[in-house]
Amino acid sequence: MSELFWFEKYRPRSFDEVVDLEEVKARLRQFVKAGNMPHLLFYGPPGTGKTTMALVLARELYGEYWRENTLELNASDERGINVIRERVKEFARTAPVGKAPFKLVILDEADNMTSDAQQALRRIMEIYAQNTRFILLANYVSGIIEPIQSRTVMIRFSPLPKEAVFARLRYIAENEGVKVSDDALEAIYEFTQGDMRRAINALQIAATVSKAVTEEVVAKALGMVSPRLLRETLYEAVKGSFGKAATQIYGFVADGGVGELEIIKQIHREMLRLDVQEYVKPEIAYIIAEAHYAILRGAHGLTQIYGALAKVRRLLKSV
């Protein structure tokens, strides 16, 4: 197996290689066909393809000259708006290489910038609009000031569907000589929730443990509880022997080395899948959320987990 991070090794280089995101690809292809584009704002959760799509767009626009015509910046890494201004100024003052009518600046984590810094960024975008286009990347559109939102075409990126993640993971596993079971893919998706970057990283970590990646291997590698085993334990806790379930949960922590925070997160997801009346699920979610918050505040993790499960058990017996 290559030592290179698989997420970078298998990052798509063209629109055709990008899984899912059909509507986004269709819009960006129109810009490539026209040879022109507005400023863009890509927003959505981490690992949903924002950076990848920005780089693919650069490749499609500029071909072999995409590196010369593209400047990548990270708002968190740069030392303030003045550094960004100077780097953009230096980049924009030279003509695009090849036949491109403009250069491209990709600014990641733009929502981490202060409002004042974003106001300065807005002015930079206006000053260099004649020969430079910006693609801003953000996890939360609410973190971007309205004057920038109104000057960009906003494109939303959603968590990737399970089928798209599975297809990509199977492709990578086959290329790396790794066997991965369907249960392992389910466990990875459970852990990463549609974040492709985390899913690929999770597969690579699991593959360092064994070239035959199973659900158990994934759980061990990622420091989580096997989803199947957790479901059985939760069923025992709410409908069977509570003492037996408590012993199993203690084992997850003491023997398996799984953190209480990870367990409560997994419990939250699994509890909402219980076969119970829909009106009860918000109450269950609130009980688990209270325990989660208490653990974050420093309360004893196992005590909070046991208490939450006992409350859910009583609730389900009362309905």
From Swiss-Prot:
It comes from the Archaea. InterPro entries: AAA+_ATPase, ATPase_AAA_core, DNA_pol3_clamp-load_cplx_C, DNA_Rep/Repair_Clamp_Loader, P-loop_NTPase, Rep_factor-C_ssu_arc, Rep_factorC_C, RFC_lid. ATP binds at G44, P45, P46, G47, T48, G49, K50, T51. Transmembrane segments: none annotated. Keywords: ATP-binding, DNA replication, Nucleotide-binding. The keyword NADP does not apply. GO terms for molecular function: ATP binding; ATP hydrolysis activity; DNA binding; DNA clamp loader activity. GO terms for biological process: DNA repair; DNA-templated DNA replication. CDD domains: AAA, HLD_clamp_RFC. GO terms for cellular component: DNA replication factor C complex. SUPFAM superfamilies: P-loop containing nucleoside triphosphate hydrolases, post-AAA+ oligomerization domain-like. The keyword Nucleotide-binding applies. Heteromultimer composed of small subunits (RfcS) and large subunits (RfcL). Part of the RFC clamp loader complex which loads the PCNA sliding clamp onto DNA. Belongs to the activator 1 small subunits family. RfcS subfamily. This is Replication factor C small subunit 2.
